[in-house]
Amino acid sequence: MQVRRAEHAEIQSLRDAFRREMDGQIVHDSIHARLGWTLEYAITHGDRAIGYGSVAVAGPWRDRPTVYEFYLEPAFRLRAFELFDAFLDASNPQAFEVQTSDTLSTMMCLTRAQDIGTERIVFRDAATTMHTVTGATLRCVTPPDAIRTAIEERQGGGEWVVEIDGAVVARGGMLFHYNRPYSDIYMNVDEPFRRRGIGTYLVQELKRLCYELGAIPSARCSTTNEPSRRALQRAGFVPFAHILFGSLGRP
């Protein structure tokens, strides 16, 4: 077995297998496609790649190379710890940031982890709701062509506002830079209009619009933002993963 640097194209079929196994939103999916953001490593058996590891080296991770994906074909997971340590030796990362629904990456990173923390919860849709807010109307502020382009290019998104009596009281939207067909919903309610169910209503309607656009809604929230957590849950979202981070010790 060997671990060596690789181009994304070499591990594309393995990434496709990883996506199928995840069967949900992958928060860090777009990092692979951003030029210069990731160092990819192939784990090879003979002349064939049987796994890969990914280290983020740009953006928020510019000064702290960070493992965010590690994948092995199922037949080679009996050697998972050995191969993960070989990947660490080859890539020399300082930290990790993984989605706990990615069980292999999570298990491997936690084995070598120090200073573990979590700051975001990932949600998936589980129920259809029918909340209403008296006098509220939803208005799209992004041109339809721009939304369609964002869906196709997996970059950007669309934005909507909630208006009451002609005044904008909340803003939200969906982003598409995730694995197809998933989108990420976000929202913010102006302070004077909070605790009235407007956030829940907005999330509910953004979910509906996601499906109309052919996307599957997902969402994220800070672990400390209790009002947002409540709004997401009331709109039919359930938590299914954390984003864990920490530093990595050496094998």
How would you describe each model-predicted region?
Residues 26-88, 172-183, 188-191:
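Conserved donor-binding loop and adjoining core beta-sheet/short helix segment
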Residues 169, 173-218:
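Glycine/small-residue-rich hydrophobic helix-like segments
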Residues 91-101, 210-221:
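Conserved GNAT acetyl-CoA-binding A-motif
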Residues 76-89, 195-210, 229-234:
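Conserved acetyl-CoA-binding loop-helix of GNAT-fold acetyltransferases
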Residues 1-27, 117-159, 165:
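Short amphipathic alpha-helix that is part of the acyltransferase structural core
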Residues 57-65, 69-135, 246-248:
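Acyl-donor-binding surface of acyltransferase catalytic domains
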Residues 45-62, 132-133, 140-144, 149-181:
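Acetyl-CoA-dependent GNAT
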Residues 108-109, 232, 237:
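Conserved active-site tyrosine of GNAT-family acetyltransferases
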